[in-house]
């Protein structure tokens, strides 16, 4: 738990530096349900105004990916002109996050979209992700 706290503290500091001068607070969107504990710990460490929202996206049945992405719960926040941080606990292939990023771009018109992930399983990566910090667990 101490290591997780240190990771959240470091990421929170980096995110604060990135967004503290924003006119419009950034929106942190948690991908439920797995991201909830990480997102709660992370946003406690962000020391600038933010908005939060969440989505529920499914592409798995049990432990296997179906290849079909379903948006089960959409966001409720207007993202127009805002920076967005998608918060996820684990990234595997990246297909679902890439789909969601494009969905947000095409439907909500944010200024910018970043992805913040706790654990990166690089084994089957299908997309590139921007890393705030290189973290090895």
What is each of the regions a protein language model found here?
Residues 1-137:
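PRPP-associated nucleotide enzymes
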